[in-house]
Amino acid sequence: MQLTELIETTVTGLGYELVELERTGRGMLCIYIDQPAGISLDDCEKVTRQLQHVLTVENIDYERLEVSSPGLDRPLKKLADFERFAGSEVSVTLKKPLDGRKTYRGILHAPNGETIGLEFEGKKGEAAMLDFTLADIDKARLIPQVDFRSRK
């Protein structure tokens, strides 16, 4: 079983989604998990303990294991991610330029089949629409929306 498959099976078996897996040159494994209700420290601890056990049993070599939430600027990789975060502000970088640019920032529209829509500000300030598929994307991330005003 491949490392990604092993980790994804373990993470989903615990009720979480594997967002991303990074393996650094120094033997560090970084695992990013999520669920609709968000991720707590207890969630990270639970997944860490289970993965430590599984990686030991499977004799997978690593120096350090880090499990965390994907953060406010989480990557969007699967069609389900684009569905879940429809209506959110995102940044999308395409593999090939379209109309002379590769990076777009705008409001995500829910996928229609395999096609994903992004409403962005066009050249003359008017609203424009970009339609793309997962195959067109180099990377896509949520744009963090942070409100520092106090809630009174």
Swiss-Prot record:
Provide the coiled-coil residue spans: none
Per its UniProt record, what Pfam families does this chain match?
A: DUF150_C, RimP_N
Matching entries from InterPro entries are given as: Ribosome_maturation_RimP, RimP_C, RimP_C_sf, RimP_N, RimP_N_sf
> What is the superkingdom listed in this entry's lineage?
Bacteria
The subcellular location is: Cytoplasm
Q: What is one GO cellular-component annotation here?
A: cytosol
Coarse class of the protein's main subcellular location:
cytoplasm
One of the GO biological process terms: translation
Keywords of the record, alphabetical order, are:
Cytoplasm, Ribosome biogenesis
Q: Which family does it belong to?
A: Belongs to the RimP family.
Q: What does this protein do?
A: Required for maturation of 30S ribosomal subunits.
Question: What is the designated name of this protein?
Answer: Ribosome maturation factor RimP
Q: To which species is this protein native?
A: Burkholderia cenocepacia (strain ATCC BAA-245 / DSM 16553 / LMG 16656 / NCTC 13227 / J2315 / CF5610)
